[in-house]
Amino acid sequence: EPPPWVPV
């Protein structure tokens, strides 16, 4: 799970 600031 990427950090919240990474657009996915």
From Swiss-Prot:
Give the location in the cell. Answer: Secreted
Name a GO CC annotation attached to this entry. Answer: extracellular region
Keyword annotations for this protein, in alphabetical order, are: Secreted
Distribution of this protein across tissues and organs: Expressed by the parotoid glands.
Q: Does the keyword Secreted apply?
A: yes
Q: What is this protein called?
A: Tryptophyllin-like peptide PbT-1
